[in-house]
Amino acid sequence: MLKSLLCILLIFGCLCRIHGVMFHLTPNTQKCLKEDIQANQLVMGEYEVSDVPGQIIDYIARDTKGHILSQKEHITKGKFSFTSEVFDAYEICFISKVPPHQRGISQEVSLVTKKGVETKNYEGIGEASKLKPLEVDLKRLEDLSDSIVRDFAVMRKREEEMRDTNEKTNSRVLFFSIFSMCCLLGLATWQVLYLRRYFKAKKLIE
């Protein structure tokens, strides 16, 4: 029983929403990381930038409408957090700034982000509720299960919306095709009748 539970916890641990990335930022460029996030989700992140004298890196977190959710200049190491208001694609950008007179070199940037369930402090919850370690793991497992179910529900809803949009688009294309065909037939009929009258007027045909 315990082994089965540990296997389940391991599987759900692989599904955790903790994302870590490391990259090199070229001088005087910016790199943005984008991800779709559900509405009303807490997003927490931790970053660290290699120190290069005279070079500056700023970061900014925003949505597709350009609303700034978190921002800081001259970063080296720190944390940030924001809450998504609506379902949208949110991006975190790191911007390198090097003075014109200085020869810049690439800087290493590491970023770890958590969202939703993984932002909870289960150790603190366990201490406050006086839960055993196994009970804390079960609580984490329950929250992860609920989160995955909600994500699947949202995905299903989006799929239905996309299918409805696709069906409406197909109906409009079909209507436009029929309308275009009718217009072409009408134009062809008018042209035949016009040419017939023209040739009769010129006495080219009876």
Curated annotation (Swiss-Prot):
One of its GO terms (cellular component) is membrane. PROSITE patterns: GOLD. GO terms for molecular function: cargo receptor activity. Residues 194-206 are cytoplasmic. It comes from the Eukaryota. The keyword DNA-binding does not apply. Its main location: membrane. Residues 30-140 form the GOLD domain. It is a single-pass type I membrane protein. The chain crosses the membrane at residues 173-193. Disulfide bonds: none annotated. It is found in: Membrane. Keywords: Developmental protein, Membrane, Signal, Transmembrane, Transmembrane helix. Residues 21-172 are lumenal. Residues 1-20 form the signal peptide. One of its GO terms (biological process) is endoplasmic reticulum to Golgi vesicle-mediated transport. The keyword Membrane applies. Belongs to the EMP24/GP25L family. PANTHER family: TRANSMEMBRANE EMP24 DOMAIN-CONTAINING PROTEIN. Eca and bai are essential, though not redundant, for dorsoventral patterning of the embryo. Specifically required during early embryogenesis for the activity of maternal tkv, while the zygotic tkv is not affected. This is Transmembrane emp24 domain-containing protein bai. It comes from Drosophila grimshawi (Hawaiian fruit fly). The lineage of its organism: Eukaryota, Metazoa, Ecdysozoa, Arthropoda, Hexapoda.
